A protein has these predicted regions:
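An anion/pyrophosphate-binding glycine-rich loop and adjacent beta-alpha core
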Residues: 30, 237, 243-349, 410, ...
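Glycine-rich active-site loop/strand segments that organize a redox cofactor
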Residues: 43-74
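Conserved redox-cofactor binding core of oxidoreductases
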Residues: 86-201, 213, 257-260, 280
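Core beta-strand elements of the Rossmann-like FAD/NAD(P) dinucleotide-binding domain
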Residues: 199-209, 370-374
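N-terminal Rossmann-like FAD-binding beta1-loop-alpha1 element of flavoenzymes
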Residues: 1-24
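Active-site-proximal substrate-binding core of FAD-dependent oxidoreductases
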Residues: 244-259, 383-395, 405-428
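Glycine-rich loop(s) and the adjacent beta-strand/alpha-helix scaffold that form part
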Residues: 209-263, 267, 395-406
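Glycine-rich FAD pyrophosphate-binding loop
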Residues: 17-42
């Protein structure tokens, strides 16, 4: 049982045994996950010489409150994850002529390089840089990297005969079962979920293992870049059952969303824009901060400047970025701003901080196992400690994929060992 059709939920499904039936539910349509909204890119360890720098950048951004083991696992796993994404048809920008690498060519080249002893299959790819990164290490697809990755994963999952996706189905509780009292929270383990479909029918779905990958908490905020239906349902249910939670106060505010008086989800202006040279300006057109500091630092600087200026926003100028880069790297941002009346190639745009990401969540170990047996969590729903108190830009997709795969691998290992949930004395 998987709850959520974002990157974590889909990648978990792809890594579970094909001889097991897998049911995925999602609160809205399958495409309405925050993973689809991710703009900037996905980090990767370019080569071994970048390890220390990447590790330090992640730790520093997280105020050194990160779980070091988790950071190491994520970084060490990144190259394998990227290889798998390319194999699934994900296209990342290449150096030559801004052309993206298609899957067959990438796979063929990767195999050839490996057979010849070359370890770095990433040499032909273009990398961008974002705030708090000491060097470029972010792969990207225009300014819709999340959509590119997640749509390809969703297509792969939909092709699997052993997986069924139920849309417009909301988890309302988990099923817990008593054991011999030796494992889990007070001898209880997860045995499935309770859900409600679009017609209001209550569904009791039994499963030996459950993965919670239902996203973050942005729907609880008035101003957020998240979809409004992401309201932390899994956290509420976990708390009800005494499942361990961690760092619920670790909420990231993104420095730059397009200012608007309209209600609803805020449109993100990717950090990659600042990585490529955009600068922040006060009401007088004066630059007031280093745009490539960690997100919480830049957010604080913007809020302080807004207070000084007595304004509801500051300005972002892309004048230092050439027009071709804007049109090729940031076409979605360019088009959206045009729709809102701003031509970013000719004028500044108003930006304001908004809630963006949840670093806390349901506590999990390095295999994404929660404190309740047979219950796993991955993606923004979970807290494995990678991000510490503040997430480094473009680590979210990578973290979701790495630890979703580890959850699937752990479940497969337990199934191979004969582990099935005992459905005794069920409660909900």
């Amino acid at each position: 049982m998987i709850v959520g059709t974002g990157a974590a939920g889909l990648f978990a499904a792809l890594n579970l045994p094909r001889d097991r039936k897998v049911l995925i539910i999602t609160k809205k349509d399958a495409e309405s996950s925050d993973s689809f909204l991710a703009q900037g890119g996905i980090c990767v360890l370019k080569d071994e010489s970048d390890y220390e720098s990447y590790f330090e950048d992640t730790m520093r951004a997280g105020h050194y409150e990160n779980r070091k083991e988790s950071v190491d696992i994520m970084i060490r796993s990144s190259r394998e994850i990227i290889r798998e994404l390319i194999g699934y048809g994900v296209k990342f920008e290449r150096k030559d002529s801004g052309r993206e690498q298609d899957a067959p060519e990438a796979q063929k080249k990767t195999e050839k390089q490996q057979s010849e002893g070359h370890e770095n299959f990433l040499d032909d790819y273009a990398f961008t840089r974002e705030g708090a990164h000491s060097k470029p290490r972010i792969l990207f697809h225009e300014d819709v990297t999340g959509k590119e990755i997640t749509s390809k994963l969703l297509a792969q999952v939909r092709s699997l005969e052993n997986v069924c996706i139920m849309e417009y189905t909301t988890m309302t509780d988990i099923i817990v079962a008593g054991t011999d009292g030796q494992t889990g929270e007070d001898g209880m383990q997860c045995a499935g979920i309770i859900a409600e479909d679009a017609q209001g029918n209550v569904l009791k779905i039994h499963a030996p293992y459950t993965i919670l990958a239902s996203g973050g908490i942005g729907g609880l905020y008035e101003h957020s870049t998240n979809y409004p239906h992401l309201t932390g349902d899994a956290l509420r249910i976990a708390e009800k059952h005494g499942i361990r939670l961690e760092h619920l106060d670790y909420v990231q505010i993104h420095p730059t969303t397009l200012y608007s008086r309209k209600p609803g989800r805020r449109f993100l202006i990717s950090e990659s824009v600042r990585g490529e040279g955009a600068i922040l300006l006060d009401k007088n057109g004066k630059r007031f901060t280093d745009e490539l500091q960690p997100r919480d630092v830049v957010t604080a600087a913007i809020r302080e400047q807004m207070k000084k200026d007595g304004t509801d926003h500051v300005w972002l100028s892309m004048e230092r970025i050439d027009k071709d880069t804007i049109l090729n790297h940031f076409p979605n941002i360019y088009e959206h701003c045009l729709e809102e009346g701003y031509d970013v190639t000719k004028e500044w745009i108003p930006v304001v901080p908004a809630q963006h990401y949840f670093m806390g969540g349901i506590w999990v170990d390095s295999d994404s196992q929660t404190s309740m047996e047979h219950l796993f969590a991955a993606g923004e729903t979970s807290c494995n400690g990678v991000h510490g108190a503040n997430r480094l830009a473009s680590n979210s997709l990578l973290e979701s994929l790495v630890f979703a795969k580890r959850a699937a691998q752990k479940i497969e290992a337990e199934l191979d060992a004969g582990g099935e949930a005992e459905q005794l004395d069920e409660t909900a």
